[in-house]
Curated annotation (Swiss-Prot):
InterPro entries: DUF520, UPF0234-like_C, UPF0234_N, YajQ-like_sf. Belongs to the YajQ family. The keyword Nucleotide-binding applies. Nucleotide-binding protein. Keywords: Nucleotide-binding. GO terms for cellular component: cytosol. This is Nucleotide-binding protein CJA_2652.
């Protein structure tokens, strides 16, 4: 029986490259000369630090551009509010990976609502969709791509 998995993954290597490229761009920019501005990454958590909130916003734009160039969807960023400590302004971000229970339930409900001849089941941080025909699965993929669910999704493990 044909099936595929709906997942939300971010490549760690591409994320590291994006953060490193953003750091290089910031160190070379004229308006950041003499400013203590830096990006720090630990697993899927990114912290940006600068002297002013305006610079923090510019750094966020640079990071988003670098992520887009590396093929990472910027909608997976969960950005927290700014924290001020002395001269420094900080902002923490988390790169969301995996499909949480609420989103998985939305995906299953969307598949059932379209009355396609497929079944969707939640398996941890992914959703498995099975059906009798390959065409039904491809139609389901098109439906999920068209839906705005607020999280980037990939479709992998497609089996006949």
């Amino acid at each position: 029986m044909p099936s595929f998995d709906v997942v939300s993954e971010v490549d760690k290597h591409a994320l590291t490259n994006a953060v490193d490229q953003a750091q290089r761009l910031i160190t070379n920019r004229f308006d950041f000369k003499g400013v203590d501005a830096k990006f720090e990454r630990k697993e899927f958590d990114i912290t940006i630090t600068a002297d002013a909130d305006m610079q923090l916003d510019q750094m966020l734009d640079v990071l988003r551009t670098a992520m887009a160039k590396n093929g990472i969807d910027v909608s997976c960023l969960d950005i927290s509010s700014m924290k001020t400590s002395g001269k420094q302004v900080k902002r923490d971000m988390t790169v969301r990976t995996g499909i949480d229970k609420e989103l998985a339930k939305k995906i299953v409900a969307l598949v059932k609502e379209k009355k396609l001849k497929v079944q969707a089941s939640i398996q941890g941080d992914q959703v498995r969709v099975t059906g009798k025909k390959r065409d039904d699965l491809q139609e389901c993929i098109a439906t999920l791509r068209a839906a705005e669910l607020g999280m980037p999704m990939q479709f992998n493990n497609f089996r006949d």
